[in-house]
């Protein structure tokens, strides 16, 4: 789980830097984004768009990092919220711009990856043990079969 936590932290830092760069670009060079934003509710509202991206979306990533470092008990919730906000922001951008481009795939994918890693951290998603394929024949040994989630919400042994 140490690797998963490290990936979550790295992903949150990547998202922080990305939202910071995006917000600064919106403020420093709004002409780059004018063609995209002119036909939306953000036409001429570059400061508002920068604040939403840098403070709100980036802020959730900052909180995820803070929780990750200081309040480990809340780590899954912090990253789940940050990933959800990122995916929501990207989905909103796609709807407002009526387009989907590679940056949407990159940062939306990073948000989805953040959510998937939280599921791995919580034990909801687990790897197949000792299996390298999804064959149709059952494995002769129990260790090669699917591992069901355990604990209060799983169906396997606690």
Region spans (language model):
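Topology signature of small-to-medium multi-pass alpha-helical membrane proteins
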Residues: 1-158
């Amino acid at each position: 789980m140490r690797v998963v936590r490290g990936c979550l932290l790295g992903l949150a830092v990547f998202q922080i830097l990305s939202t910071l760069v995006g917000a600064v670009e919106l403020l420093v060079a709004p002409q780059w984004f004018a063609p995209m934003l002119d036909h939306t509710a953000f036409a001429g509202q570059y400061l508002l768009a920068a604040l939403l991206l840098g403070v709100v979306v980036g802020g959730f990533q900052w909180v995820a990092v803070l929780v990750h470092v200081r309040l480990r008990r809340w780590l899954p919730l912090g990253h789940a919220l940050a990933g959800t906000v990122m995916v929501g922001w990207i989905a909103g951008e796609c709807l407002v711009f009526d387009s989907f481009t590679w940056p949407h795939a990159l940062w939306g994918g990073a948000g989805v990856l953040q959510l998937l890693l939280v599921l791995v951290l919580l034990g909801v998603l687990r790897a197949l043990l000792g299996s390298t394929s999804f064959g149709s024949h059952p494995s002769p040994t129990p260790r090669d079969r699917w591992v069901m989630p355990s604990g209060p919400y799983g169906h396997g042994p606690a």
